[in-house]
Design a protein with these regions (language model features):
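A short acidic, glycine/proline-enriched capping/turn motif at secondary-structure boundaries
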Residues: 58-60, 99-100
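Acidic-leg catalytic submotif of subtilisin-like serine proteases
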Residues: 11-17, 21
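Active-site-adjacent betaalpha module
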Residues: 1-11, 39-42, 46-47, 69-213
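A short acidic, helix-capping loop that chelates divalent metal ions and anchors anionic groups
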Residues: 21-24, 62-63
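Short, glycine/acidic-enriched loop or turn micro-motifs at the edges of active sites
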Residues: 19, 58, 151
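A short alpha/beta connector and helix-capping loop motif
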Residues: 26-56
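Metal-dependent catalytic neighborhoods of phosphoester/phosphodiester hydrolases
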Residues: 63-69
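Short beta-strand segments at enzyme active-site cores
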Residues: 15, 49-56, 62, 146
C-alpha cells in the first residue's frame, strides 16, 4: 500500500547502517542507499522529528542451520557510518538480534515521546529491516517503509519483503514521497531536533507550529 500520510508524532528508524555492514556485497549501490537515508535524516531533523540510529553487535544465541560467524566482531565493525551525521539528540539502539525492538528499550523510548508512526530504512531488507518493521507493527505503531532507502545481500530476499511482507505491515513510499509528505505536513523547526532552553516535549515550538497549521 502506497504512503498516504504521516502522523504528527512520527520517528525515523535507520537500521544497521554501520561500517561493517555497508562493506558487505549488496544488490543496490550502497552509496545510493546511504544518500537516501541521509536525506531522510536531514528532513526529520529539520522538522524536529525523532531519529533512531540502530547498530548490531552480534547475533541471537539460538542454533541455526546456516553456519554462524564466531568470535568478536572486528574493531569498528559496529560503528555507525559518519554520513548519518549523528546528533546528541538521536536515539541510538544497539542490538544483538535482527529487530531493533527485541531486548531493547526502543518501544518505551518511542512511546515516551508519544510516537505513533515509524519510517524505516536501512540494511538488510529481509532481516534487520523486516524484523524491525514486524516488531513495530506488533507494538502498535503505524509503519512506513522507505523502499528505495534499503537493500539486501540477496535480491530475492529484498524483492520478497517488498512484495509480500511489507504490504501486510504498513505502507511503502520512496524517499522523495516521504520527504514531500514531511514538507507538506510539518512546519520547519528552527531548533531541528536539538531543542534546548526548556522547549522539549509538549512545549516544543515545532509541535506548537504543527498544532496551529
Amino acid at each position: 500500500m502506497a504512503l498516504t500520510t504521516l502522523d504528527p508524532h512520527t520517528a525515523l528508524i535507520i537500521v544497521d547502517l554501520q561500517k561493517g555492514i555497508i562493506s558487505l556485497p549488496v544488490v543496490h549501490p550502497i552509496g545510493d542507499i546511504i544518500e537516501r537515508a541521509r536525506a531522510l535524516a536531514d528532513a526529520f531533523r529539520a522538522r524536529g522529528l525523532p531519529i533512531v540510529l540502530v547498530n548490531v553487535t552480534g547475533r541471537a544465541p539460538g542454533r541455526t542451520e546456516q553456519p554462524r560467524q564466531t568470535g568478536p566482531c572486528p574493531e569498528g565493525w559496529s560503528d555507525l557510518i559518519p554520513e548519518l551525521n549523528q546528533q546528541p539528540s538521536d536515539i541510538v539502539v544497539t542490538k544483538r538480534t535482527w529487530g531493533a525492538f527485541a531486548s531493547t528499550d526502543l518501544e518505551a523510548q518511542l512511546k515516551g515521546l508519544d510516537i505513533t508512526q515509524v519510517v524505516i530504512a536501512g540494511v538488510a531488507t529481509g532481516t534487520g529491516v523486516e524484523a524491525t518493521a514486524r516488531q513495530a507493527y506488533e507494538h502498535g505503531f503505524n509503519v512506513t517503509l522507505a523502499i528505495d532507502a534499503m537493500t539486501d545481500m540477496r535480491l530475492e530476499a529484498h524483492a520478497y519483503s517488498i512484495a509480500n511482507v511489507f504490504p501486510r505491515l504498513g505502507e511503502a513510499g520512496t524517499t522523495r514521497n516521504i520527504i514531500d509528505n514531511i514538507n507538506s505536513k510539518f512546519a520547519y523547526c528552527p531548533f531541528g531536533n536539538r531543542c534546548t532552553e526548556g522547549v522539549e516535549g509538549n512545549d516544543c515550538i515545532g509541535k506548537i507550529l504543527f498544532d496551529y497549521r
